[in-house]
A protein has these predicted regions:
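Non-transmembrane, aqueous-exposed alpha-helical and coiled segments at domain scale
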Residues: 1-423
């Protein structure tokens, strides 16, 4: 068998959690390959909204095995609360969730380092979620980090202490005023570590490759979005991991030739949380309406998302970098009621019109060029077939397909798993 990938093509918050939930029944294993609790995957069904931060979105399906891969960074405290939330709904976590021993741990001092580093940047801050993600990945690449497998070692606490002391020295170097009680944070951390020990740790690269040999199907689930990729995103306003398709191979230990389909998820408009370039951002009532109707607030941070028109230049870039084979468009229902819709098809950059992302994509350097499309009035939330969609939306979809060269296979018309139309 092969592995299919599911990725976000924008700046995150595209709706990946819902689509994983919809697709899970087709797969034996759902595997998360990068990121940490800075991202929230939102799922809604039976009138209840669920937000997952580290655990794969397949956990709600009783026949699926869920893997947290080696490319993920885990905060035991956040993870413990996530487990407790699932247990309230009698979700069987114990037998269906396995964690890679090679996944790195977020320490309390990683979170403090994150806060100190961001505070020291002043106006140049990048909009970090302050969850300790960046410092943890820094320790990983610097070969200083602690991994899940280290929990099983007799000298784990000594290893923790040595690393935490290094962090405190670094925090003091920043000379910022942080209010914290490290003793309380550490007590909470080690309590969560004891709970983490109750779960199954695995060598996930061996587990997944053996599963492929046995003919099992795997869906690799990404976090954040392609435009936040550490290499290919709008650097330095990016996350600390590879959110693109290549990250699935390194984050799970699977070979590139095992990958079959790549599903790219994108909103029918564009959003972004935090700082960074956003060429099609709206600052008027239209943007405010998108935010209100789309309930555009971060599922983890609660921060308001910036909203703007669909950027096809950026979308095509993400499609190409990921080798996307099928597109899933989300939140078309949010655009219902707009008389006209704008779609960005190129940029004005240094006196020229270009159709690719430039190296320096600062707002003052890039101006979007729009094509205007007719909007639709119809409420989409109750529709169940592609034929029932308004002609204007179908034309919108066709325009996107022709521009990026990849078919749109799914149209989401609401947050519930049932509000998903297969084309």
């Amino acid at each position: 068998m092969t592995v299919d990938l599911l990725l976000g093509l924008q700046w995150g918050d595209e709706g990946k959690g819902k689509i994983v939930d919809v697709l899970t029944s087709k797969y034996d294993i759902i595997a998360r390959f990068q990121g940490g609790p800075n991202a929230g995957h939102t799922l809604e069904f039976d009138g209840i909204k669920h937000v997952l931060r580290t655990i794969p979105s397949g956990i709600f399906h009783k026949n699926s095995i869920n893997i947290i891969g080696n490319g993920v960074v885990m905060d035991p405290v956040v993870f413990q609360k996530e487990i407790e939330g699932l247990q309230k709904f009698n979700i069987d976590v114990q037998s269906r969730l396995f964690i890679s021993r090679k996944a790195h741990l977020i320490l309390p001092t990683h979170r403090l380092l994150d806060a100190a580093s961001e505070a020291a940047k002043g106006k140049a801050k990048i909009g970090s979620t302050l969850k300790g993600i960046g410092p943890t990945y820094m320790d990983k690449t610097g070969r200083n980090g602690l991994r899940v497998g280290d929990i099983e070692l007799v000298d784990f606490k000594e290893r923790y202490k040595a690393l935490a002391e290094k962090h405190i020295e670094m925090i003091d170097f920043y000379k910022v005023d942080l209010q914290y009680n490290l003793a309380e944070m550490e007590e909470e951390f080690f309590t969560a570590i004891e709970d983490l020990k109750k779960l199954t740790f695995i060598d996930s690269e061996f587990y997944l490759n053996q599963a492929l040999k046995e003919g099992k199907s795997i869906l690799a689930e990404g976090a954040q979005g392609s435009l936040l990729d550490i290499d290919f995103g709008t650097y330095p306003f990016v996350t600390s991991s590879n959110t693109t398709a290549a990250g699935a191979c390194t984050g799970l230990g699977i070979a590139p030739n095992k990958v079959k389909d790549v599903f790219g998820i994108f909103k029918a408009y564009t959003t972004r949380v935090g700082s960074g370039p956003f060429p099609t951002e709206l600052f008027d009532e239209v943007g405010q309406t998108m935010a209100k109707v789309g309930n555009e607030f971060g599922s983890v941070t609660g921060r308001a998302r910036r909203c703007g028109w669909l950027d096809l230049v950026a979308l095509k870039y993400a499609v190409e970098v990921n080798g996307v084979t099928a597109l899933y468009t989300m939140k078309g229902d949010v655009l219902s009621g707009f008389e006209t819709l704008n779609i960005c098809t190129s940029y004005k950059y240094k006196g020229e019109e270009i159709d690719h992302l430039p190296y320096n994509i600062e707002e003052e350097n890039v101006q979007p060029v729009f094509v205007e499309k007719k909007g639709w009035k119809q409420d989409l939330t109750g529709l169940t077939s592609y034929d029932a969609l308004p002609i204007e939306l179908k034309e919108y979809i066709t325009f996107i397909e022709e521009y990026v060269g990849v078919p749109i296979k799914v149209v989401s018309v609401g947050p519930d798993r049932k509000q998903t139309i297969m084309k």
